[in-house]
């Protein structure tokens, strides 16, 4: 992009000469020398993409930080870079291009554009079959590419290796959902476990569909970009809202999780303030909120991102503690369990669906890989490992505790065992690093809507984040049912993100190139997702209302 940067410029100059030198072939069989010719011919025609000017512009950066391990750095919201996302989006609609007045100091695109990606041929999508080879994206395949920094000091790496991509995928998929798989097994019965494997297979397939959507146009990088390419600006906004609601709901789950586990450790804790008596559950929910609040105020969450990368280790540790307690300490009733529980099977549907809520991050992982051709192998590894962990925990937990299995298996563990203390405290500590990273994308998207005359006041950003944090506390206290809330999230939101939107976007983007087999398979997945969403959401909501009324 031959664009001269200035202090008032929205886009910055691309280093064309450096890009040409760094443009190297990683997949000899997939690309011919003609790719370089196409690259050179298109360099003069590269223009800023409309996908970088529609709300939310902060999605790429915030999700990259949420799902990856960047370079460390720390600061608070008072820094000027905090205010770079604020602008008046609504004055001329959500797709208005920003003027220099609305973004006075921005000298880099809010969604980093790579010259190599822009030059990618438009015919990358194969119509011969869904899993047939296609040319991979080139924007992340330069060996010596530097990690560029954008607003909020968030690194934008384009050199992720296979191992890093797998780690990032596992870090997203191996979340708190693993605590509820024994409860899901109890709600659905042993045969209900088949739902877990079916969802795992379908989720892997829809993850591949996202890749094909991204490869349909060279400047698609994120899930909202895919929504816009498929259904216009309305699609982008709808997809973004669903993704942000899912992240917000996860933060509510963190509050409930902390409250439940800490109150199990200290059941007699209580506090009286001004005539109000707080029991253990309410007290620890409040203390958790106050503890995570300063981390949400941080401008740069890179340090937390480093720590949260240990979430995979934490999940493995908790699983090992469960197996140790069951096999070595021989704790549990060793129940045979129920073969199939039709009355509560819909709750299990949402719980199993929640286990695969990682599609919001998959496009970011794909576009950041040094070798995008390895993306299917990355997904296969992530889904394979996570499915085995989920199934193993479900079988072990349900076998140990039977019909007394609670929504989090940590609540069933005997409190006097060392392994129990390790498992519970690991479960308690992990969300403290995850919370800020999870709520930040939501906060940053709202900060974009701050009127331009207020974007330099960091107090607006602090106010938004504080309100978000305390709102999760209020929701968590109002609906303190960890398993049912998770089932509702899995049914209502995860089904949309994982099973419904990817094939719908694929069919809309590819259109006439879709084969009959692909069409039938995508429609089938959409039907499965829609039915699961309706049944699971209705069941979870009805049980929540029933518990609240009782």
Swiss-Prot record:
Q: Where is this region: Disordered?
A: 1-44, 128-148
Determine if Nucleus is one of this entry's keywords.
Answer: no
* Compositional bias per record (Polar residues), positions renumbered to this chain: 1-11
Pfam families in the record, alphabetically?
Aa_trans (PF01490)
- Report any one BP term from Gene Ontology: amino acid transport
Q: Where is the composition biased (Basic and acidic residues)?
A: 20-34
InterPro entries xref list: AA_transpt_TM
Q: Where is the signal peptide?
A: none
Keyword Transport in record: yes
The record's Gene Ontology cellular component field reads: membrane; plant-type vacuole
Tell me the domain of life. Eukaryota
Tell me how this protein sits in the membrane: Multi-pass membrane protein
Keywords linked to the UniProt accession: Amino-acid transport, Membrane, Transmembrane, Transmembrane helix, Transport
Intracellular or extracellular location(s): Membrane
List membrane-spanning regions. Answer: 165-185, 190-210, 237-257, 283-303, 307-327, 342-362, 377-397, 422-442, 462-484, 488-510, 521-541
- Provide the family line: Belongs to the amino acid/polyamine transporter 2 family. Amino acid/auxin permease (AAAP) (TC 2.A.18.5) subfamily.
Protein name as it appears in the record: Amino acid transporter AVT1C
Which species does the entry assign this protein to? Arabidopsis thaliana (Mouse-ear cress)
Underlying gene: AVT1C
């Amino acid at each position: 992009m031959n664009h001269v940067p200035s202090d008032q410029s929205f886009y910055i100059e691309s280093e064309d000469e450096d890009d040409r030198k760094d443009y190297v072939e990683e997949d000899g069989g997939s690309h011919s020398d003609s790719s370089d010719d196409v690259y050179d011919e298109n360099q003069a025609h590269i223009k800023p993409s409309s996908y970088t000017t529609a709300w939310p512009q902060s999605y790429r950066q915030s999700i990259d930080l949420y799902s990856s391990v960047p370079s460390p750095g720390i600061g608070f919201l008072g820094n000027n870079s905090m205010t770079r996302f604020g602008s008046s989006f609504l004055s001329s609609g959500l797709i208005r291009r920003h003027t220099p007045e609305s973004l006075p100091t921005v000298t880099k695109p809010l969604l980093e554009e790579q010259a190599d990606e822009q030059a990618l041929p438009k015919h990358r999508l194969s119509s011969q079959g869904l899993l047939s080879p296609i040319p991979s994206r080139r924007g992340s395949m330069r060996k010596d590419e530097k990690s560029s920094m954008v607003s909020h000091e968030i690194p934008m790496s384009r050199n992720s290796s296979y191992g890093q991509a797998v780690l990032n995928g596992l870090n997203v998929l191996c979340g708190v959902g693993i605590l509820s798989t024994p409860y899901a097994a109890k709600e659905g019965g042993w045969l209900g476990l088949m739902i877990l494997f079916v969802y795992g297979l379908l989720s892997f397939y829809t993850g591949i569909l996202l890749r094909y959507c991204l490869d349909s146009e060279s400047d698609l990088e994120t899930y909202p970009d895919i929504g816009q390419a498929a259904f216009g600006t309305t699609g982008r906004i709808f997809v973004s809202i669903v993704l942000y609601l899912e992240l917000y709901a996860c933060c509510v789950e963190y509050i409930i999780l902390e409250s439940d586990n800490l109150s199990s450790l200290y059941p007699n804790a209580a506090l009286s303030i001004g005539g109000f008596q707080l029991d253990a559950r309410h007290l620890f929910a409040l203390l958790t909120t106050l503890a995570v609040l300063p981390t949400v105020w941080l401008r740069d969450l890179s340090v937390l991102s480093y720590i949260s990368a240990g979430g995979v280790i934490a999940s493995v540790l908790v699983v090992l503690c469960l197996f140790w307690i069951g096999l070595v300490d021989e704790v549990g009733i060793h129940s045979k369990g129920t073969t199939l529980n039709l009355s509560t099977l819909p709750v299990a549907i949402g719980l199993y669906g929640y286990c695969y809520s990682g599609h919001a991050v998959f496009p970011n992982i794909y576009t950041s890989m040094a070798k995008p051709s390895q993306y299917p192998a990355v997904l296969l590894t992530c889904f394979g490992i996570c499915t085995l962990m989920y199934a193993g925990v479900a079988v072990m937990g349900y076998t140990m505790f039977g019909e007394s299995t609670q929504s989090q298996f940590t609540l069933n563990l005997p409190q006097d065992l060392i392994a129990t203390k390790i498992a519970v405290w690991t479960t308690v500590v992990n969300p403290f690093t995850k919370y800020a990273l999870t709520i930040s994308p939501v906060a940053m998207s709202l900060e974009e809507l701050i009127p331009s005359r207020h974007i330099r006041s960091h107090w607006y950003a602090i106010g938004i984040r504080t309100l978000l944090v305390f709102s999760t506390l209020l929701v968590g206290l109002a609906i303190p049912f960890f398993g049912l809330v998770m089932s509702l999230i899995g049914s209502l939101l995860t089904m949309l993100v994982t099973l419904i939107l990817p094939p719908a976007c694929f069919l809309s983007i590819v259109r006439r190139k879709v084969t009959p087999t692909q069409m039938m398979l995508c429609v089938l997945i959409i039907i499965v997702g829609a039915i699961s969403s309706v049944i699971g959401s209705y069941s979870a909501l009805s049980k929540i209302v029933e518990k609240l009324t009782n």
